[in-house]
């Protein structure tokens, strides 16, 4: 009995010892829980680079906004391409204005803002580009062709008109009032280069045109910068002798009317003598320099008793008035 009791006691102690070895202590339980939390935290950190892991916490609109932001490099490339396209379109506009200015000068037409927009700017082009395109075209004309665009302001001849004429709304000068401000090309080359035959275009029509123009301007200049129609017509008829038309292939009256429309002459009705009076126009004063007029008069009126000092003084006054009005 005593042996059995001993054995039973031994078994109880063994089971108790086994139970003590298997059952974890409180400190072990806490350590195991902390280790488990640490493992889960590390797994979350490893998966944080994947956008899909945040699906439950990120709204669908937020993911859409993130996708719409696009690649910064792609946006920069698109921006550069757009700037390059704008630069190309700008240069095309500049070249169009340069071509139009040269063609207008060749055909003796004035250059107006309205015509530039209609003929040099494609449909749909912003009018806000006009000033910058015009300035760049002027710069390229100077660098490549030796010309610059000069503003011309229509002369105000009301001070020279008779009182009865001022009361009439329609005048010959009013027909060109739409050209109260326009541009023409003027050479920036030195005078010796302008006279160089190698740089002068050999054109019979241009030579005849400018010859007739300079003759008319010179005659008006030596007549104290104004002359009546009958006196000017008589002078031109003597030069043309038996010819019925001028070098412009028009009769005298129509030729003078053409020069008025082109801005080289101003024409005012004189009720006192019932005829037109011609003045040197703003365009002629702008394009024909004082030195150019003096050279022409000296060459083609060598035997005349013209007072060149008085002539140049009057013409210089007209030139200065035009220069100041153009600058304004």
Curated annotation (Swiss-Prot):
Residues 31-54 have a biased composition (Acidic residues). Sumoylated by nse2. Gene3D superfamilies: MAGE homology domain, winged helix WH1 motif, MAGE homology domain, winged helix WH2 motif. It is found in: Nucleus. GO terms for biological process: DNA repair; double-strand break repair via homologous recombination; meiotic cell cycle. It comes from the Eukaryota. GO terms for molecular function: double-stranded DNA binding. GO terms for cellular component: nucleus; Smc5-Smc6 complex. The keyword Nucleus applies. Residues 1-19 have a biased composition (Polar residues). Keywords: DNA damage, DNA recombination, DNA repair, Meiosis, Nucleus, Ubl conjugation. Acts in a DNA repair pathway for removal of UV-induced DNA damage that is distinct from classical nucleotide excision repair and in repair of ionizing radiation damage. Functions in homologous recombination repair of DNA double strand breaks and in recovery of stalled replication forks. Plays a critical role in meiosis. Two subcomplexes smc5-smc6-nse2 and nse1-nse3-nse4 exist. These subcomplexes are then brought together via a number of interactions, forming the Smc5-Smc6 complex. This is Non-structural maintenance of chromosome element 3. It comes from Schizosaccharomyces pombe (strain 972 / ATCC 24843) (Fission yeast).
């Amino acid at each position: 009995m005593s042996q059995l009791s001993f054995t039973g006691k031994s078994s109880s102690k063994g089971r108790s010892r086994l139970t003590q070895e298997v059952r974890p202590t409180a400190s072990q339980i806490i350590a195991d829980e902390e280790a488990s939390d640490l493992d889960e935290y590390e797994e979350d950190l490893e998966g944080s680079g994947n956008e899909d892991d945040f699906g439950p916490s990120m709204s669908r609109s937020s993911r859409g906004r993130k996708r719409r932001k696009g690649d910064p490099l792609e946006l920069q490339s698109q921006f550069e391409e757009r700037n390059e396209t704008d630069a190309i379109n700008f240069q095309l506009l500049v070249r169009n204005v340069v071509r139009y200015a040269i063609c207008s000068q060749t055909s003796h037409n004035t250059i107006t803002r309205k015509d530039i927009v209609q003929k040099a700017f494609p449909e749909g082009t912003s009018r806000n580009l006009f000033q910058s395109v015009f300035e760049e075209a002027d710069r390229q004309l100077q660098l490549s062709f030796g010309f610059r665009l000069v503003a011309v302001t229509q002369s105000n001849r009301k001070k020279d008109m008779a009182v009865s004429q001022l009361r009439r709304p329609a005048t010959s000068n009013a027909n060109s009032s739409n050209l109260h401000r326009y541009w023409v090309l003027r050479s920036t080359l030195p005078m010796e280069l302008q006279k160089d035959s190698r740089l002068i275009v050999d054109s019979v029509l241009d030579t005849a045109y400018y010859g007739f123009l300079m003759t008319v301007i010179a005659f008006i200049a030596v007549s104290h910068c104004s002359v009546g129609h009958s006196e000017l017509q008589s002078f031109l008829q003597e030069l043309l002798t038996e010819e019925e038309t001028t070098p412009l292939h028009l009769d005298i009256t129509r030729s003078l009317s053409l020069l008025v429309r082109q801005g080289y002459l101003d024409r005012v009705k004189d009720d006192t003598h019932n005829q037109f009076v011609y003045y040197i126009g703003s365009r002629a004063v702008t394009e024909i320099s004082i030195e150019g007029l003096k050279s022409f008069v000296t060459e083609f009126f060598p035997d005349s008793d013209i007072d060149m000092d008085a002539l140049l003084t009057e013409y210089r006054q007209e030139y200065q008035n035009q220069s100041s009005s153009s600058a304004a």
